[in-house]
Amino acid sequence: MAYFALGLATATKNRDGKIIEAFFPTPILAPSDALVAALAPIAGYQEGNQALDITAAQSAQLAAVFAAHQQAASAAFADKAANAKQPLVLVILASDDKPQSVAEGYLKLQLISHRLVKPHGTVLDGIFGLLHNIAWTNEGPIDLPELAERQIEARLAGRVLTVDCVDKFPKMVDYVVPAGIRIADTSRVRLGAHVGEGTTVMHEGFINFNAGTTGVSMVEGRISAGVVVGNGSDIGGGASIMGTLSGGGKVVVSIGENSLLGANAGLGFPLGDRCTVESGLYVTAGTKVRTLDKDGNQVDIVKARDLAGVSDLLFRRNSLTGQIECLANKSAVELNSELHKNN
């Protein structure tokens, strides 16, 4: 049978012995049947989607199996994990179903951030309710109900426990830093973000989980959950893209290739290739738009959603009438290559 994914992780457990987060440095997409069959008797895997606790001795055995099946990175990690002080867990996903455990959820998020699957490339239904709300501290992740006691213990021991954030999703770079990217403020890119090679995320840029860029992009605005930005597109400073989580929306908002969402602009419908939304203009799916011909004459008045995915369009607000207009985009967007030299 075809398996979806697997990965060995070091995990953090709370005082109830429940896993609250897991670090998969070498996730494997579409593992071979032979690899799963060799891992199964060691880990006690039977069938379906399982998260299995692994001992140090088992980890050493797993290392040999990974090596025998040409999974060098996983073999090296499993070999080191044989001396780990942290709990270990092996997750095997026979099928791509909604995650049933924290470990499964973390594996799926890391599949995206490792660029093994694209946003919407794996089922994440229910993950928000599955994950724990965690205090991410200088001493690692702490389950929120345990934070106050840990702070007291640290102070009495002469230490200060610093809380960087309280969230269900950690920052991506604590788990993986994909090749060829720059992130000015790492706290603004969540685990589960897909950051394409050549992407720069500036200080005010933000990328949520199950969202991101596919290639070279300059991100100075907000890419909400579920949003995908195509290669060569630019998200201007303070710009906002509506996510599928907002208002229970079902439409997947996306931006095609070589498009520009201007500074402080907003988008609530799928934009095609080589499109421009002028600075300060927020276009939602229901916005009424005047379409113009090449001579500036009105052709029709439509809702923006009717122009979803159409390429080579310029959206602007008429400064005299206040009406939103759409016409052919005559200037292609080109990102400044100098800004991406060090990626």
From Swiss-Prot:
Instruction: Tell me the domain of life.
Output: Bacteria
* SUPFAM superfamilies per the UniProt record, alphabetical: Trimeric LpxA-like enzymes
- Subunit arrangement? Homotrimer.
Where, by residue number, does succinyl-CoA bind? R222, G237, S240, A263, E278, S279, G286, K303, R316, R317, N318, S319
Tell me the gene name.
Answer: dapD
Which Gene Ontology terms of cellular component type are present? cytoplasm
Molecular function GO labels: 2,3,4,5-tetrahydropyridine-2,6-dicarboxylate N-succinyltransferase activity; magnesium ion binding
Instruction: Tell me the keywords, alphabetical order.
Output: Acyltransferase, Amino-acid biosynthesis, Cytoplasm, Diaminopimelate biosynthesis, Lysine biosynthesis, Magnesium, Metal-binding, Transferase
Source organism lineage? Bacteria, Pseudomonadati, Pseudomonadota, Gammaproteobacteria, Vibrionales
Per the record's keyword annotation, is Lyase included, yes or no?
no
Q: What is its EC number?
A: 2.3.1.117
Q: What metabolic or biological pathway is this protein involved in?
A: Amino-acid biosynthesis; L-lysine biosynthesis via DAP pathway; LL-2,6-diaminopimelate from (S)-tetrahydrodipicolinate (succinylase route): step 1/3
| Catalytic activity from the UniProt record | (S)-2,3,4,5-tetrahydrodipicolinate + succinyl-CoA + H2O = (S)-2-succinylamino-6-oxoheptanedioate + CoA
Q: Which residues form the active site?
A: E220
Name used for this protein in its record: 2,3,4,5-tetrahydropyridine-2,6-dicarboxylate N-succinyltransferase
Q: What does this protein do?
A: Catalyzes the conversion of the cyclic tetrahydrodipicolinate (THDP) into the acyclic N-succinyl-L-2-amino-6-oxopimelate using succinyl-CoA.
Q: Which family does it belong to?
A: Belongs to the type 2 tetrahydrodipicolinate N-succinyltransferase family.
